[in-house]
Amino acid sequence: MANYFNTLNLRQQLAQLGKCRFMGRDEFADGASYLQGKKVVIVGCGAQGLNQGLNMRDSGLDISYALRKEAIAEKRASWRKATENGFKVGTYEELIPQADLVVNLTPDKQHSDVVRTVQPLMKDGAALGYSHGFNIVEVGEQIRKDITVVMVAPKCPGTEVREEYKRGFGVPTLIAVHPENDPKGEGMAIAKAWAAATGGHRAGVLESSFVAEVKSDLMGEQTILCGMLQAGSLLCFDKLVEEGTDPAYAEKLIQFGWETITEALKQGGITLMMDRLSNPAKLRAYALSEQLKEIMAPLFQKHMDDIISGEFSSGMMADWANDDKKLLTWREETGKTAFETAPQYEGKIGEQEYFDKGVLMIAMVKAGVELAFETMVDSGIIEESAYYESLHELPLIANTIARKRLYEMNVVISDTAEYGNYLFSYACVPLLKPFMAELQPGDLGKAIPEGAVDNAQLRDVNEAIRCHAIEQVGKKLRGYMTDMKRIAVAG
């Protein structure tokens, strides 16, 4: 099979990369009615599989789970989760032939095997659903021409998808129809009904493409969402300890600092995050972020280039074929780092202390968010898509680090995201070491003293922060998410 994106001509590539339309709430007036009375079979009962299924059932849909025979016979975790929640569970052979919509929510590396198994069992004219388009775009999976292929991609972990639904809300969601597989022209109706059934229509839905979702998702998770947080954690911890900070305190400042800082980001973008600093600290954070952007821009561009060309995917799939040798080696090495093995700090760190003593961390967040956004937009991805794959998801990933450090982040994210994270962080850490050596007192671990600032300089910095394109689009998109619950649990 050939990478689907690479089979397109340039005009087609640009058209699919640039497909992004914010959908009006009136477009979801029919809710999930298009799928009511039809059989929806979910393959996979992980975080997305279970929680999307719970939401869809609560929205009145007929949901069941198709699992492998051995998973049922051995009563594995997927079988236990589905049965304990009262769902009908059966084998592929028992459930797939009756399904009107088969939703594949297994891990990326299992998609080819799953699709090749279920496709011959699917009835004529059925639909196949994904929540991530890697299998279609990067693997180039060929789907029977009578099958409609759609995507509904919530921009949150599965647990958040469920919690927001229970609150009567939802999470921002991308939907798409694969242009090669919409024989009856019903793909958009199916995707809209599925999105409504998960509650996504209450938080904002973007009509996108499989290509735009995959390329932007890969870029975001590799760079700012996971790679930058991992590289920043390791670099900042080592710097603090090198300068005499208690390792336990240093670990807590970083582990919970990302979450506290990005909670401000979630509520009011980069502007609010920077406004939490004193004026001297804001000017310093801005200067540091500009330096970081200049240093890291080529690395961000390389990741985007490798994602667009398919180089990243081919390398990762080669590692799949080699029993994940690189992934497992990197995972083991990360677990042995000083940050991951540092003792726990029993004292309390106040919320403002994370800002006052984390100026460098704030600069890293600002630089990483802006670079990821700018690089995606420069590559043809529309601003709304770039926002969701950079700034929007960052607080959610930071929250995983607050639970159990980098270990938890890498457990929760997909293997695809984890592989890309290591590629980025292993390149970024040595790249930034000379920069780290030149830091000034007050950049990390100590507060910058209050002092006089130049009014014109402060005015210009504030203007530059607020006028960045990500702040403009973010203000609009956050307007649809004002009811989402607060994430941070740091203390």
Swiss-Prot record:
Pathway the protein acts in: Amino-acid biosynthesis; L-isoleucine biosynthesis; L-isoleucine from 2-oxobutanoate: step 2/4; Amino-acid biosynthesis; L-valine biosynthesis; L-valine from pyruvate: step 2/4
GO molecular function: ketol-acid reductoisomerase activity; magnesium ion binding
Keyword terms of this UniProt record: Amino-acid biosynthesis, Branched-chain amino acid biosynthesis, Magnesium, Metal-binding, NADP, Oxidoreductase, Repeat
Residue ranges constituting the KARI C-terminal knotted domain according to the UniProt record: 209-344, 345-484
Catalysed reaction equations from the record: (2R)-2,3-dihydroxy-3-methylbutanoate + NADP(+) = (2S)-2-acetolactate + NADPH + H(+); (2R,3R)-2,3-dihydroxy-3-methylpentanoate + NADP(+) = (S)-2-ethyl-2-hydroxy-3-oxobutanoate + NADPH + H(+)
Domain KARI N-terminal Rossmann: residue ranges: 15-208
Functional summary from the UniProt entry: Involved in the biosynthesis of branched-chain amino acids (BCAA). Catalyzes an alkyl-migration followed by a ketol-acid reduction of (S)-2-acetolactate (S2AL) to yield (R)-2,3-dihydroxy-isovalerate. In the isomerase reaction, S2AL is rearranged via a Mg-dependent methyl migration to produce 3-hydroxy-3-methyl-2-ketobutyrate (HMKB). In the reductase reaction, this 2-ketoacid undergoes a metal-dependent reduction by NADPH to yield (R)-2,3-dihydroxy-isovalerate.
Binding site for NADP(+): 45-48, 68, 76, 78, 108-110, 158
Annotated NCBIfam families: ilvC, PRK05225.1
Gene name for this UniProt entry: ilvC
One of the GO BP terms on file: L-valine biosynthetic process
HAMAP family associated with the record: IlvC
UniProt-annotated binding residues for substrate: 414
Binding residues for Mg(2+) 2: 217, 389, 393
Keyword Oxidoreductase: yes
Active-site residues (renumbered): 132
Enzyme Commission numbers on file: 1.1.1.86
Protein name from the UniProt record: Ketol-acid reductoisomerase (NADP(+))
Free-text remark on how the cofactor is bound: Binds 2 magnesium ions per subunit.
Family, per entry: Belongs to the ketol-acid reductoisomerase family.
Gene Ontology, cellular component aspect: cytosol
Cofactor(s) needed: Mg(2+)
Chain sites annotated for binding Mg(2+) 1: 217, 221
Organism whose genome encodes this protein: Shigella boydii serotype 18 (strain CDC 3083-94 / BS512)
